[in-house]
Curated annotation (Swiss-Prot):
Topological domain spans for side Extracellular: 29-99, 157-167, 249-265, 327-367, 487-495
Keyword field: Glycoprotein, Membrane, Signal, Transmembrane, Transmembrane helix
Superkingdom of origin organism: Eukaryota
Full protein name: Transmembrane protein 161A
Membrane topology: Multi-pass membrane protein
Cytoplasmic topological domain residue ranges: 121-135, 189-227, 287-305, 389-465
An example Gene Ontology CC term for this record: membrane
Cellular compartments annotated: Membrane
Any single Pfam family the record assigns to this protein: Tmemb_161AB
Signal peptide per UniProt: 1-28
Species whose genome carries this gene: Danio rerio
Transmembrane segments: 100-120, 136-156, 168-188, 228-248, 266-286, 306-326, 368-388, 466-486
Job description of the protein: May play a role in protection against oxidative stress.
Record InterPro entries: Transmembrane_161A/B (IPR019395)
Length: 495
């Protein structure tokens, strides 16, 4: 039986630390409350009246009786008043009232601990021969991907529950567009898009056919392949709908961040590289452009091998990780660009004629800050999806970080509960304990057979195809939605 050993101990220790330290030490809370982000405080009615050159109206009892319900008329001020919002650093007390703050803190902290577990596991496998142990890091990576999708679903459900139907229509439109694109991508041959889905499905179906025949079942492989691809296309449509608003928001914060750093050309270059990083990820899975070109680069009348096949796979993994780290390092610029929307809205209001209620100004400025964690999740989750899909691809797909010859990786071993000696029974319950031992042995034998069958079905070839396609698809969805967002904010918003 395979034991988790050191990995299980470290994993349980990480879970315990995460649970106990969350109220005291949280990376997610530090990201928003380290003093680098500045929020804008909404003006009070007294400040607005002073800028408008009048006093705060006092309502008499007679006016309240005439209004019927004791409500005073809303205070209005001219839109072109000389209003300048006061900025203050975001602190912990401010962050506690933000929308989806609990979900944000839990997800980001879990991703940080998952990264630590992954780094420990990689170091552990480089020192110890742990081929018979379960790769706990891959489980953490898969869980992080699932939790990211769950959080995006919570955000999207918020749009569907709102009274306005515009956000719901956008999600549905991107979902149907993603469904069409996914069906087109899934019929492209492996000679052009080298996900490895076909070899992965072939391995899965062949192994499952052997398993089904042993159980006495007959099934049709062509029908199963078609149904699996249709199901995968539906999942792609769902992911595309989830990534619609994160891409649109990324486009807006990118444009504002570039404008905000107009006097810092190096930051602008990094922002543009970060924005175009999904395009680089997409190109790296196009075989004629990436692998074939680097494997047989034309040099006059001859061709030169710049990278071997295994070295290219490692370079691709490293490139994706570096691009994700770059985008994570630029998080603060995007978040500050979003917070600056409050001052940007005030400047736009000054150009308009007429009057506006003071409560509307206060509500608009406050609403921008209240959705800071939503915008942070929309920026970070696509990055985490790509990053942890790539890490899972490396671990479960038996890839290597080195540029030399590809070494066989670690295939997840079946998780089998270890049997511990039962306590010594008394004379009165010998028969009950014997029956219990027989039940436990039967359960262990059944689980052993089940996990052995799953290990034979889910091979590294299958995991390579699934996680390579997931990584590529998330990057493609974000590129499509963000480019549409650039077009929307640059042209449609000004017309």
């Amino acid at each position: 039986m395979a034991l988790m050993g050191v990995q299980l101990v470290v994993s349980l220790l990480a879970v315990s630390i995460m649970q106990r330290m969350a109220p005291h030490l949280s990376f997610a809370r530090w990201l928003l409350c380290n003093g680098s982000l500045l929020k804008f405080r909404h003006p009070s009615e007294g400040e607005l009246c002073a800028l408008a050159g009048k006093q705060i109206p006092k309502t008499s009892r007679r006016d309240r009786r005439q209004n019927g319900h004791g409500e005073s008329k809303p205070l209005t001020v001219p839109k072109d008043i000389d209003l300048h919002l006061e900025s203050t650093p975001v602190n912990v007390m401010d962050a506690l009232v933000l929308r989806f703050f609990v979900e944000y803190q839990w997800l980001i902290d879990f991703a940080v601990y998952a990264t630590g577990i992954y780094l420990f596991t990689e170091g552990y496998y480089s020192v110890v021969d742990a081929s018979k142990e379960v790769n706990i890091a891959s489980i953490w990576c898969v869980l992080t991907v699932l939790f990211c999708l769950r959080t995006l679903y919570l955000l999207m459900s918020h749009y569907f529950l709102s009274e306005e139907g515009g956000e719901r229509s956008v999600c549905l439109a991107f979902g149907f567009l993603s469904l069409l694109i996914a069906m087109l991508v899934l019929v492209v041959r492996e000679d052009y898009l080298e996900f490895g889905l076909e070899p992965g499905f072939t391995s899965l179906f062949d192994n499952f056919e052997v398993f089904a025949r042993k159980q006495g079942y007959e099934w049709s492989v062509p029908f199963t392949k078609l149904s699996v691809k249709l199901g995968l296309a539906v999942i792609c449509a769902f992911i595309g709908a989830l990534l619609a608003f994160p891409g649109l928001r990324l486009a807006q914060t990118h444009l504002d961040a570039v404008q905000m750093n107009a006097d810092r050309p190096m930051i602008q270059i990094l922002l543009h590289m970060s924005f175009l990083s999904p395009l680089v990820i997409i190109v790296m899975w196009i075989k004629p452009i990436a692998r074939d070109f680097l494997g047989n680069a034309p040099m006059g009348k001859t061709s030169v091998t710049l990278l071997s096949s295994s070295a290219f796979s490692s370079v691709r993994l490293w490139t994706i990780v570096v691009l994700c780290v770059l985008r994570l390092l630029l998080t603060r610029y995007h978040l500050q660009a979003y917070l600056n929307l409050a001052q940007k809205w005030v400047e736009q209001m000054k150009k308009e004629a007429g009057r506006i209620a003071a409560i509307d100004i206060q509500r608009k400025v406050t609403r921008i800050f209240c959705y800071l964690t939503v915008v942070t999740l929309q920026y970070l989750i696509p990055i985490l999806l790509v990053l942890f899909s790539t890490l899972a691809l490396k671990s479960l797909g038996d890839f290597s970080w080195g540029l030399g010859a590809e070494t066989p990786g670690v295939t997840p071993a079946p998780i089998i509960p270890s049997s511990t000696p039962p306590p010594v029974p008394g004379p009165e319950d010998d028969e009950d304990m014997e029956d219990m031992e027989e039940d436990i042995q039967a359960t262990v034998a059944h689980l052993t057979e089940l996990f052995s069958a799953l290990r034979a079905l889910l091979t590294p070839i299958f995991f390579r195809g699934i996680f390579a396609f997931l990584t590529w698809w998330v990057a493609a969805c974000q590129l499509i939605s963000s480019l549409f967002g650039i077009y929307f904010h640059q042209y449609l918003m000004h017309n």
